[in-house]
Amino acid sequence: MNRQREFYYYAEQVTKRTGVGLRKMQSQDRHREVAEARYCLIYLMRHKMKLTLMEIAKLMRRHYSTVHHGLEVMHILQVTMKKYTRLKEIKRYEHHNIRPRDTMYICN
């Protein structure tokens, strides 16, 4: 249950910054803004939650190789574009950071 709250916390952080909801990130939509938001969430799950590629793939409804590709893209974006380095500034999830009802609006 705590992992689920942590997942929704990071999804909410990405939604606040990009305007792309969780359902859209989990969809098959390949538009640039959706793909970048998806990759941001994948990055946070890997580096903040310490999930494996398979665990991330299951949560994001993707194949693990797609998750791996997303992490590679995020690495390149962080090196070339300053706005992507701000992902590291997102605070680590703590149980008192968020209440369960706060996550209800993020799914478009």
State each model region's role.
Residues 63-67:
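Helix-turn-helix DNA-binding helix
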Residues 54-59:
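Short alpha-helical "recognition helix" segments of helix-turn-helix
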Residues 16-38:
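Short, Lys/Arg-enriched anionic-surface-contact patches
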Residues 34-51:
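Short, amphipathic alpha-helical "recognition" segments used to contact nucleic acids or chromatin
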Residues 11, 52-53:
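Helix-turn-helix DNA-binding elements, focusing on the entry/boundary residues of the two helices
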Residues 11, 77-104:
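Short Lys/Arg-enriched helix C-cap and helix-to-coil transition segments
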Residues 46, 71, 78:
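DNA major-groove recognition helix of helix-turn-helix
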